[in-house]
Protein backbone atom coordinates (compact mmCIF):
# COMPACT_ATOMS: atom_id res chain seq x y z
CA UNK A 1 0.00 0.00 0.00
CA UNK A 2 1.26 3.48 -0.86
CA UNK A 3 2.23 5.84 1.91
CA UNK A 4 0.12 9.01 1.74
CA UNK A 5 2.05 11.23 4.16
CA UNK A 6 3.13 14.75 3.23
CA UNK A 7 6.65 14.60 4.61
CA UNK A 8 9.42 17.18 4.47
CA UNK A 9 10.99 15.54 1.42
CA UNK A 10 7.83 16.31 -0.58
CA UNK A 11 8.16 20.08 -0.06
CA UNK A 12 10.10 22.79 -1.82
CA UNK A 13 12.04 24.30 1.05
CA UNK A 14 14.57 26.83 -0.22
CA UNK A 15 14.35 29.93 -2.41
CA UNK A 16 16.70 28.19 -4.89
CA UNK A 17 14.17 25.39 -5.38
CA UNK A 18 11.42 27.92 -6.12
CA UNK A 19 13.70 29.94 -8.42
CA UNK A 20 14.45 26.88 -10.57
CA UNK A 21 10.74 26.16 -11.01
CA UNK A 22 9.93 29.78 -11.92
CA UNK A 23 12.75 29.90 -14.50
CA UNK A 24 11.82 26.89 -16.63
CA UNK A 25 8.37 25.50 -16.09
CA UNK A 26 5.38 23.92 -17.76
CA UNK A 27 2.21 25.81 -16.90
CA UNK A 28 -1.34 24.74 -16.25
CA UNK A 29 -3.73 27.43 -15.21
CA UNK A 30 -7.25 28.55 -14.65
CA UNK A 31 -8.84 31.85 -13.64
CA UNK A 32 -8.40 30.80 -9.99
CA UNK A 33 -4.85 29.43 -9.80
CA UNK A 34 -1.75 28.51 -11.77
CA UNK A 35 0.46 25.47 -11.29
CA UNK A 36 4.05 25.54 -12.53
CA UNK A 37 5.90 22.25 -12.97
CA UNK A 38 9.53 21.45 -13.68
CA UNK A 39 11.18 18.00 -13.74
CA UNK A 40 13.45 17.24 -10.79
CA UNK A 41 16.26 14.71 -10.31
CA UNK A 42 14.45 12.91 -7.51
CA UNK A 43 12.09 9.98 -7.84
CA UNK A 44 9.14 11.79 -6.27
CA UNK A 45 7.21 15.04 -6.76
CA UNK A 46 7.60 18.08 -4.51
CA UNK A 47 5.17 20.90 -3.78
CA UNK A 48 5.64 24.60 -3.14
CA UNK A 49 2.94 27.19 -2.50
CA UNK A 50 2.75 30.88 -3.36
CA UNK A 51 -0.29 32.54 -1.81
CA UNK A 52 0.23 36.33 -1.74
CA UNK A 53 -1.64 38.59 0.68
CA UNK A 54 -2.53 40.70 -2.32
CA UNK A 55 -4.54 37.80 -3.79
CA UNK A 56 -6.17 36.27 -0.69
CA UNK A 57 -6.49 39.01 1.91
CA UNK A 58 -7.10 37.14 5.18
CA UNK A 59 -4.72 34.73 6.92
CA UNK A 60 -7.49 32.15 7.48
CA UNK A 61 -8.30 32.32 3.76
CA UNK A 62 -4.65 31.77 2.77
CA UNK A 63 -4.29 28.93 5.28
CA UNK A 64 -7.48 27.29 4.04
CA UNK A 65 -6.30 27.46 0.42
CA UNK A 66 -2.91 25.98 1.33
CA UNK A 67 -4.51 23.20 3.38
CA UNK A 68 -6.74 22.14 0.48
CA UNK A 69 -3.85 22.22 -2.03
CA UNK A 70 -1.59 20.18 0.28
CA UNK A 71 -4.34 17.61 0.81
CA UNK A 72 -4.97 17.30 -2.93
CA UNK A 73 -1.23 16.87 -3.55
CA UNK A 74 -0.91 14.33 -0.74
CA UNK A 75 -3.67 12.18 -2.23
CA UNK A 76 -2.31 12.45 -5.80
CA UNK A 77 1.43 12.21 -5.08
CA UNK A 78 1.80 8.64 -6.35
CA UNK A 79 0.09 9.49 -9.65
CA UNK A 80 2.26 12.55 -10.31
CA UNK A 81 5.58 12.52 -12.19
CA UNK A 82 8.86 13.44 -10.48
CA UNK A 83 8.39 17.19 -10.85
CA UNK A 84 8.67 20.22 -8.63
CA UNK A 85 5.27 21.94 -8.53
CA UNK A 86 4.49 25.49 -7.41
CA UNK A 87 0.82 26.41 -6.95
CA UNK A 88 0.12 30.13 -7.26
CA UNK A 89 -3.20 31.49 -5.97
CA UNK A 90 -5.17 34.16 -7.80
CA UNK A 91 -7.77 36.50 -6.31
CA UNK A 92 -10.79 34.40 -7.21
CA UNK A 93 -9.36 31.25 -5.55
CA UNK A 94 -10.90 32.26 -2.22
CA UNK A 95 -14.39 32.18 -3.80
CA UNK A 96 -14.21 28.45 -4.62
CA UNK A 97 -15.80 25.82 -2.40
CA UNK A 98 -13.64 22.93 -1.19
CA UNK A 99 -15.22 20.59 -3.73
CA UNK A 100 -14.69 23.00 -6.63
CA UNK A 101 -11.07 23.56 -5.63
CA UNK A 102 -10.41 19.80 -5.38
CA UNK A 103 -11.94 19.21 -8.84
CA UNK A 104 -9.93 22.05 -10.35
CA UNK A 105 -6.70 20.78 -8.79
CA UNK A 106 -7.39 17.23 -10.04
CA UNK A 107 -7.87 18.56 -13.56
CA UNK A 108 -4.64 20.60 -13.43
CA UNK A 109 -2.58 17.76 -11.87
CA UNK A 110 -3.81 15.50 -14.68
CA UNK A 111 -2.96 18.08 -17.36
CA UNK A 112 0.57 18.56 -15.98
CA UNK A 113 1.12 14.81 -15.74
CA UNK A 114 0.26 14.46 -19.43
CA UNK A 115 2.52 17.39 -20.37
CA UNK A 116 5.54 16.06 -18.51
CA UNK A 117 5.16 12.52 -19.86
CA UNK A 118 5.07 13.83 -23.40
UniProtKB/Swiss-Prot annotation:
Q: Name one Pfam family in it.
A: Ribonuclease_P
State if Repeat is listed as a keyword. Answer: no
GO CC annotation = ribonuclease P complex
| EC numbers | 3.1.26.5
Q: Which GO terms describe its biological process?
A: tRNA 5'-leader removal
Signal sequence, renumbered to the chain: none
Gene3D superfamilies hit by this protein: 3.30.230.10
- Known InterPro entries for this protein? Ribosomal_Su5_D2-typ_SF, Ribsml_uS5_D2-typ_fold_subgr, RNase_P
* Reaction equation(s) it catalyzes: Endonucleolytic cleavage of RNA, removing 5'-extranucleotides from tRNA precursor
Q: Which UniProt keywords apply?
A: Endonuclease, Hydrolase, Nuclease, RNA-binding, tRNA processing
- Gene Ontology terms for molecular function: 3'-tRNA processing endoribonuclease activity; ribonuclease P activity; tRNA binding
Record's subunit section: Consists of a catalytic RNA component (M1 or rnpB) and a protein subunit.
Q: What does this protein do?
A: RNaseP catalyzes the removal of the 5'-leader sequence from pre-tRNA to produce the mature 5'-terminus. It can also cleave other RNA substrates such as 4.5S RNA. The protein component plays an auxiliary but essential role in vivo by binding to the 5'-leader sequence and broadening the substrate specificity of the ribozyme.
Question: Family per UniProt?
Answer: Belongs to the RnpA family.
Specify the protein name.
Ribonuclease P protein component
Q: What's the source species' lineage? A: Bacteria, Pseudomonadati, Pseudomonadota, Gammaproteobacteria, Vibrionales
Amino acid sequence: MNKLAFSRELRLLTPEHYKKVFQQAHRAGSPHLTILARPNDLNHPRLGLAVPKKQIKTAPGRNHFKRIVRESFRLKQHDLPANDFVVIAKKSASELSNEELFKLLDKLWHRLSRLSRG
